[in-house]
Amino acid sequence: MRTFLLCLGVWLSPSVWAAHAYAQFGDIKYPEGFSHFSYVNPTAPKGGEIAMVSPSRASSFDKYNPFTLKGTAPPGLGSLMLETLLTGNSDEPTTAYGLLAEDVNVAKDKLSVTFRLNPLARFHNGDPVLAMDVKYSYDRLTSKEAAPQFRTYFSEVAGVVVVSEREIRFNFKRANAELPLIVGSMSVFSHKWGADKPLDKIITDVPIGSGPYKLGQVDFGKDIQYVRDKNYWAKNLNVRKGMFNFDRISYRLYKDTTAQFEGFKAGEFDYIQAFVAREWARGYKGKLFDNGTLIKKELQHGNAGDFQGFMFNTRLPKFKDARVRQAIGLAMDYEWMNRQLFYQAYTRVRGYFVGSDFEAKDLPDTDELNLLEPMRDMLDPAIFTQPVPLPPVTSLDPASGHTLRDHLRQARDLLAQAGWTYRDGALRNAKGEAFTLEFLDNSGSMGRVVTPYAKNLEKLGFKVVYKVVDFAVLQKRMDVFDFELISNRTGGSEAPGTELLERFGSKSADTEGSSNIIGVKDPAVDALLDKVVAAQTRGQLVAACKALDRVLRHGHYSVPHWYGSVHRVSWRAGRFDQPNITPRYYQPESWIQSTWWATPANFAGVR
């Protein structure tokens, strides 16, 4: 997620900003010298513990290094043990403030940014955080030994200069108002961590970070605990006051979601988030919920919606034709699923910027056309003449023209246009090859969705396979693009930016481990991504994202799923207190970890 940060403080000259915070555009809530964020309790007691489960689908971990492609790092390590030059907050999704850096200066031409480090900043080994550590971190993260997304993310950085012991400057290849935000969000670790090894050979060496927690007890691969650093350098800093109150934060990892939920009811951990509507409606009930042992709550939030869908691997020849992809999408009867499977709990995903100002609607507006016209020859003419594609809405009215039968008839016509017809018991191309579809999953939770979907696809002649594999196998197959159709979710953003280069850019399409899972390779998309990154005003950003969303949706690169408007969470009663104010923009796990605190019963070890 791209973060906007607001430049605050004193104008030192017409060409340089210097402040405790920086922004691409917008206003800020907290002035220089503010005491604490509004959604925390600055006098919250320290102590107690909270036990959680991995927010990802990982069932184990095999390394402590979160920056390499191979293997799985434990949950929580990056956010609890490592820190960045700047930190965001949950009031303002586009604003951040100094953390490791106490001062930030952006040149008027936006070709460089200089950070001055806080002299109080210390790593867990007691060493001061110095400019050479920041440069060491950057050099490591942009090396070929690191996961490829870091090289994409920092691709516009021309170089890093150690100005003095506590001053570091990032030079940029071109003026880009977002770049100070990007480098400000880079994890910083000590130059002593793995100094004698290539980054991809640092596996079980514990990162030397500066965060509020250190590594505690570990059952390697299964459970991990983090312990609060009593000498944490930033505990009295305004961006940390009233935060990270638990003495111990632990994670337990389970083989599957069934074992995980049974562990929760048995008291093995304290907090869980539900992602499946059926489980929330049918599983989160019974004696423990009725007698108040477990609390079940739907939390409101203002986050942009996440995109989720079945994503095609367009590197495969059979998915190259957009008509084929569109036809497969027409076979999903979402309305039936929402009635029968989802308890009417979801809204259909329409585009790649769910529920935000960046979502394309109807025909392109004037600002979009100004971006699209110069590339008209590269684009489908329908982009200019037809409303942006929406997922099909299945009607039960035979006269509507939008029944499932109507959609399947339309899909059959599209497949025929693309050279796929039904004969000899299957959908075949001119060579006689049958069209198979493999849906890959790791938890089995998509089975109830794929089963009715597969029945509709089989009516068109597809041979459908639903395959469940271990998370590690799934991750590896995703990394090397060895899949056909896969369910995937990407986080929404209040300010999309450079992360989209990695998600949709041609340069990342064939880079193993990249987040361009679909394999998008489109010069028009690349040109629009450049407009997104180069946006100087929010209006320019909105126009560029809407145009990008429009082009991607006309490409039918995925079968959109659904999203919910609330966080569905449950926790053990009597063990925690929380601030009176709930922020607008937050993820529940990080909000609970960073702002809640232990009750006297928790301190006493009562579960």
Regions found by a protein language model. Give the residues of each.
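N-terminal lobe/hinge region of extracytoplasmic solute-binding protein
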Residues: 18-108, 139, 208
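Detector for C-terminal structural segments
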Residues: 21, 54, 219-224, 228, ...
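Aromatic- and charge-enriched surface segment that lines or borders ligand/interaction sites
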Residues: 40-45, 67-76, 103-147, 163, ...
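Gly/Pro-rich hinge or "lid" segments in bacterial periplasmic/extracellular proteins
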Residues: 71, 77-94, 184-250, 255-259, ...
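Aromatic-rich, solvent-exposed beta-strand/loop patch
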Residues: 98-108, 124, 129, 153, ...
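Surface-exposed binding/hinge segments that line
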Residues: 116, 150-195, 210-219, 364-377, ...
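Ligand-site clamp/hinge motif
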Residues: 118, 201, 234-284, 326, ...
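Extracellular/periplasmic solute-recognition and catalytic clefts
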Residues: 159-162, 216-227, 252-316, 323-327, ...
